[in-house]
């Protein structure tokens, strides 16, 4: 949220208002340095203030990251999906968070560096199964760094695919 970002910037010692943060984000979007996604599940008023932001280039994002691996992975997926689906691309957050949701393609996508940890595996797959209960989703996908498998859970199929293979297919 804008307030959260204002608080983060304020911790650096800079005095900045929420309105200034909103202006800067609008300028950055207007100059194509990054783009935003709306929460598909949000009410109309919240769609403006509750967005996720992605850099248009992973090189720019890499300048600001301390631990870049997962963020870079999610950002490259966002860039690729944005090119393909443009304004049809959303994220979904309502009791669960799904990284990317494309209602017209009936596709829900999670991005995770690895599913080797059981807690991560459960979080990512449960979110996909939950969105499939409330939305018309036919394809459930987890994009990872280098893992590949098909998970059968609750009568649904979740495809796990490495980023390199997914990028070649899109």
Regions flagged by a language model, labelled:
Residues 1-108:
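Accessory nucleic acid-recognition modules appended to NTPase machines
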Residues 146-170:
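Domain-level recognition of nuclease-like catalytic cores that cleave nucleotide substrates
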Residues 98, 117-120, 149-153:
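Short active-site-adjacent structural elements
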Residues 54, 109, 141-143, 159-161:
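Hydrophobic/aromatic beta-strand patches that form the interior of the parallel beta-sheet core
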Residues 84, 134-135:
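Alpha-helix C-cap/termination motif
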Residues 93, 135-154:
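Nucleic-acid nuclease catalytic cores
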Residues 121-134:
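Short, charged, amphipathic alpha-helix that recurs within catalytic cores of restriction-modification
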Residues 105, 111-120:
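Short beta-strand-loop-alpha-helix junction that forms the active-site gateway
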């Amino acid at each position: 949220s804008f307030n959260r970002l204002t608080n983060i910037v304020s911790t650096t010692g800079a005095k900045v208002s929420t309105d200034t943060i909103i202006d800067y984000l609008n300028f950055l979007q207007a100059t194509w340095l990054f783009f935003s996604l709306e929460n598909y599940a949000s009410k109309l008023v919240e769609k403006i203030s509750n967005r996720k932001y992605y850099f248009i280039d992973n090189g720019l994002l890499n300048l600001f990251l301390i631990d870049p691996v997962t963020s870079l992975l999610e950002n490259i997926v966002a860039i690729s999906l944005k090119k393909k689906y443009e304004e049809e691309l959303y994220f979904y957050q309502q009791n669960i968070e799904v990284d990317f949701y494309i209602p017209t393609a009936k596709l829900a996508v999670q991005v995770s560096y690895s599913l080797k940890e059981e807690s991560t595996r459960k979080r990512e797959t449960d979110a996909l199964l939950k969105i499939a209960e409330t939305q018309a989703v036919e394809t459930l996908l987890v994009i990872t760094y280098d893992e590949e498998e098909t998970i059968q859970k609750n009568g649904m199929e979740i495809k796990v695919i490495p980023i390199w293979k997914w990028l070649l297919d899109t």
